[in-house]
A protein has these predicted regions:
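Signature of N-terminal electron-transfer/Fe-S-associated modules in redox systems
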Residues: 1-170
Length: 170
């Protein structure tokens, strides 16, 4: 069972709602989903119901949005979501090698999470940086370009060190 939406989340959703005309709070559904996922890590059925109630929407309508977009996670994911572009331009520049290396280094397949909950590996569609192929996104925000096995190893080490530092700070 999840907690109700936090005060901070409600304030952020209210800021998103304020961008739309009065009575159009449902227009903020994508922003609300992003905000809730940012706090909770993923969108559980309870989270979807919370968003639906807050925006006065049918829960199925919120689910339809969340299930349509790949940036929303309807099951738990790792602390770091690694999305590798597997479209043709990236494949021609070595995304297949990058994929194999990631899967071997993490000991997981596509759409799986490492046993320690640190990484989830996803296939992605074109990210609009074909000239920088192969491209990998971390947590849907940071774009890493020209990802060779050594660069992948460095990225994984950096993310592990970052996570260890955050755990010490907590």
């Amino acid at each position: 069972m999840t907690m109700p939406l936090s005060v901070t989340v409600c304030q952020k959703i209210d800021q998103a709602i304020a961008k739309y005309p009065a009575g159009r709070e449902q227009s903020a559904v994508m922003a609300a989903l992003t905000i809730v996922q940012s706090e909770r890590g993923w969108l559980s059925p309870e989270s979807l119901r919370d968003v639906a109630a807050y925006l006065n929407m049918p829960p199925v309508a919120v689910y339809e949005v969340a299930s349509f977009y790949s940036m929303y996670h309807l099951k738990p994911v790792g602390r770091y979501v690694l999305t590798l572009c597997t479209n043709l331009p990236c494949l021609l520049q070595g995304a297949d090698k990058a994929a194999r290396h990631l899967q071997e280094a993490l000991n997981i397949g596509w759409s799986e999470t490492t046993a320690d909950g640190m990484f989830t590996l996803l296939q992605g569609e074109c990210m609009g940086a074909c000239q920088e192929a192969p491209v990998l996104l971390t947590n849907h925000h940071r774009m890493c370009c020209k990802m060779t096995p050594p660069q992948i190893d460095a990225l994984l080490a950096q993310l592990r060190a970052e996570a260890a530092g955050k755990e010490r700070d907590e």
